[in-house]
């Protein structure tokens, strides 16, 4: 099962039944109730304290997550973490936004463009398989904008593994702030989200 060693001490982590641990275990941070430390019109600060040994990880870990609406009409996301013992940590953000403003609508009618011509292949256990797949002529081809739902029900092995779009897209211009990574547009609301 999943394990790691730090300073000569081995830690066995919660096994997902497939010999791995995903998202820090179950329940993961996404299933925890976070405390609201600050909330106003422009910012919300959330905090979660993971107790020592939770899902097998050493150290009490305090994670602070800040979402800020900036004067540049953007959303900044900032993570901070402090631990009482050496541990492993790889925080990420899986937030998603329905820019329609209508929570009864799904995102499937929204148009998406992604600056990517390759994705990471996943094996049947939803693990990165170590191979990059071209997106051309596949449901993952968002090099020309189209509705998210247009191809989501296609007969595609990679869609079947994850039950939809839950893949890593390899960007053509990574880290280049002059080129967007993705653009999402909702025709009904007129809103655009640029990442």
Tell what function each PLM region has.
Residues 1-194:
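An exposed, glycine/acidic-rich loop-and-rim segment of catalytic or binding clefts
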């Amino acid at each position: 099962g999943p394990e790691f060693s730090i300073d000569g001490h081995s830690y066995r982590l919660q096994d997902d039944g497939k010999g791995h641990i995903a998202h820090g275990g179950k329940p993961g941070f996404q299933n925890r109730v976070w405390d609201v430390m600050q909330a106003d019109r422009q910012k919300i600060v959330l905090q979660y304290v993971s107790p020592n040994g939770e899902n097998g990880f050493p150290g009490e870990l305090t994670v602070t997550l800040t979402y800020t609406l900036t004067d540049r009409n953007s959303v900044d996301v900032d993570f901070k973490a402090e631990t009482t013992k050496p541990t492993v940590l790889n925080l990420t953000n899986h937030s998603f936004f329905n820019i329609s403003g209508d929570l009864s609508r799904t995102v499937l009618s929204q148009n998406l463009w992604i600056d990517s011509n390759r994705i990471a292949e996943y094996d049947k256990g939803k693990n990165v398989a170590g191979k990059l797949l071209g997106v051309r002529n596949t449901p993952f081809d968002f090099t020309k904008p189209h509705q998210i739902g247009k191809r989501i029900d296609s007969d595609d092995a990679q869609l079947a593994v994850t039950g939809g779009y839950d893949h890593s897209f390899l960007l053509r211009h990574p880290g280049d702030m002059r080129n967007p990574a993705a653009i999402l547009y909702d025709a009904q609301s007129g809103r655009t989200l640029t990442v």
